């Protein structure tokens, strides 16, 4: 919710398989839906992804292309990928900036450290 309130962009948190939390988008459409193959690859790369080109559209879920990934920050705990913090965009929205990148990276780091406790 905090990222959504600060950026106005839909924000989702996933585990390895699907979406576990949604803010700024319909929970019915995105909650508990499996992540897309492309988002799964981003998680496996273990580095923060930021969309650079408006033509590049990576869907958040396998079931819907209504939201695409702006920033995706993998949640890492003890070297394992647990999920991802995703800041998304709808068609026509501009790519994310440095603020969104930093917020996603910070929240993913916090969640990863919290899971290690």
Identify the residue ranges that each predicted region occupies:
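Short amphipathic alpha-helical interaction segments
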Residues: 63, 67, 96-99
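Short glycine-/small-residue motifs
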Residues: 22, 83-84
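Structured interaction and signal-relay segments at domain junctions
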Residues: 1-64
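Juxtadomain coupling helices with adjacent low-complexity linkers
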Residues: 1-6, 34-40, 84-117
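A short, aliphatic-rich beta-strand micro-motif
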Residues: 69-76
């Amino acid at each position: 919710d905090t990222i959504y309130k600060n950026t106005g962009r839909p924000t989702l948190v996933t585990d390895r398989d699907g979406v576990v939390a949604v803010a700024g988008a319909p929970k019915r459409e995105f909650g508990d839906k499996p992540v897309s193959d492309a988002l799964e690859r981003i998680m496996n790369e273990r580095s923060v992804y930021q969309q650079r080109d408006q033509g590049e559209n990576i869907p958040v879920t396998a079931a819907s292309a209504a939201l695409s990934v702006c920033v995706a920050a993998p949640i890492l705990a003890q070297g394992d990928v647990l999920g991802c913090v995703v800041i998304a965009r709808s068609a026509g929205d501009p790519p994310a900036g440095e603020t969104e990148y930093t917020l996603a990276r910070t929240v993913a780091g916090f969640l990863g450290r919290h899971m290690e406790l």
